[in-house]
């Protein structure tokens, strides 16, 4: 299981940080299995923020858990919160790792690694040029704000 992989890789974790919305449930459940406190961050005016009385203690060893990591952008925003709190990032974990090129410097522990190609709009293969473009994810959904 993902919890067992995390336990083997990261010996010292004080806190789990999960970005809303997708990371909340997986972060909570992994935290329960590992007996670790879990908090989440949520977007306020487009930026991840700790709310609801959550905080990261100075020096805490923090694991970021998400449902899916594709570009790593949400994870990098979480890293900023950890640094701002003078805490330490121990690593990243997710159910599905879709990364190919990412700015995440730490190893990603995942249950599944998927290699799904992404294309620049100028270099689309002919067989997908006629398919309408959609952008999944919750980053810009207005109903969340």
List each model region and its residues.
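Active-site-facing substrate-recognition patch
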Residues: 1-12, 140-145
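Short, glycine/charge-rich flexible loops or terminal/linker lids adjacent to PRPP-binding catalytic cores
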Residues: 26-63, 71-73, 126
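Acidic, divalent-metal-coordinating active-site segment for phosphoryl/phosphodiester hydrolysis
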Residues: 68-79
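Conserved acidic residues
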Residues: 14, 60, 90
């Amino acid at each position: 299981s993902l919890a067992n992989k995390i336990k083997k890789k990261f010996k010292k974790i004080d806190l789990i940080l999960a970005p809303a919305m997708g990371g909340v449930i997986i972060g909570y459940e992994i935290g329960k299995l590992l007996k670790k406190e879990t908090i989440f961050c949520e977007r306020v005016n487009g930026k991840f923020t700790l709310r609801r009385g959550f905080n990261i203690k100075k020096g805490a060893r923090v694991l970021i858990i998400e449902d899916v990591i594709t570009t790593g952008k949400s994870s990098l925003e979480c890293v900023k919160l950890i640094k701002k709190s003078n805490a330490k990032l121990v690593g990243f974990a997710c159910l599905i790792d879709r990364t190919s090129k990412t700015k995440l410097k730490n190893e990603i522990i995942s249950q599944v690694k998927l290699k799904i190609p992404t294309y620049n709009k100028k270099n689309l293969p002919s067989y997908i040029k006629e398919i309408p473009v959609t952008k999944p994810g919750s980053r810009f959904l207005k109903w969340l704000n």
